[in-house]
């Protein structure tokens, strides 16, 4: 879906000479739009914090507190250092998903490059954390408990870890791109009443996909913190 907004035209003009497609340029434009939106909301929510919170502060405290509780419940207290990363990914993916429900807008998570970037961030963080936590012993995560099976287990584990990137990428991309295509079809057939149930379902899908990505990211990072056997 192509949306000829002025800021999209600017990004296309800027990025297409670099060999980036119009779809990729649009995804980058919406990504920066969402980053700016999240920054503005964060500044407004944290400006003049009060012991008795206002509506904006209370709303943000509920969201951030909910994510923090989920991180602690899933990863334990030692998961708190990863809360900023998990919360950032969750909020970015959620807003990216929801923005596609606004007529004329396109979710950057419906572009495979965006979802791949998020997946790579989780993948790299997982192994940096594992190496930092265990040092050379981190390789035990890839060798398994039986010594003579270690070469085969290493090969299988490496494939498994790389498949995480693929699964995180394709799950989010497939669901959001598929939903966008369905919305386009329904808007074309009946542009008023029929798409409304699909848009409501889109809200549910947006929350579920953000939650699944966040949950898997926590599980993967938690796994790298555990002792290898």
From Swiss-Prot:
Main location: membrane
Example of a GO biological process term: proton motive force-driven plasma membrane ATP synthesis
Membrane topology: Multi-pass membrane protein
Transmembrane domains' residue ranges: 25-45, 82-102, 111-131, 142-162, 181-201, 202-222
Cystine pairings recorded for this chain: none
Keyword vocabulary terms for this entry: ATP synthesis, Cell inner membrane, Cell membrane, CF(0), Hydrogen ion transport, Ion transport, Membrane, Transmembrane, Transmembrane helix, Transport
Gene Ontology CC terms: plasma membrane; proton-transporting ATP synthase complex
InterPro entries the record matches: ATP_syn_F0_a_bact/chloroplast, ATP_synth_F0_asu, ATP_synth_F0_asu_AS, F0_ATP_A_sf
Oligomeric form and interacting partners: F-type ATPases have 2 components, CF(1) - the catalytic core - and CF(0) - the membrane proton channel. CF(1) has five subunits: alpha(3), beta(3), gamma(1), delta(1), epsilon(1). CF(0) has three main subunits: a(1), b(2) and c(9-12). The alpha and beta chains form an alternating ring which encloses part of the gamma chain. CF(1) is attached to CF(0) by a central stalk formed by the gamma and epsilon chains, while a peripheral stalk is formed by the delta and b chains.
Protein purpose: Key component of the proton channel; it plays a direct role in the translocation of protons across the membrane.
Name recorded for this polypeptide: ATP synthase subunit a
Organism annotation: Geotalea daltonii (strain DSM 22248 / JCM 15807 / FRC-32)
Lineage of source species: Bacteria, Pseudomonadati, Thermodesulfobacteriota, Desulfuromonadia, Geobacterales
Gene: atpB
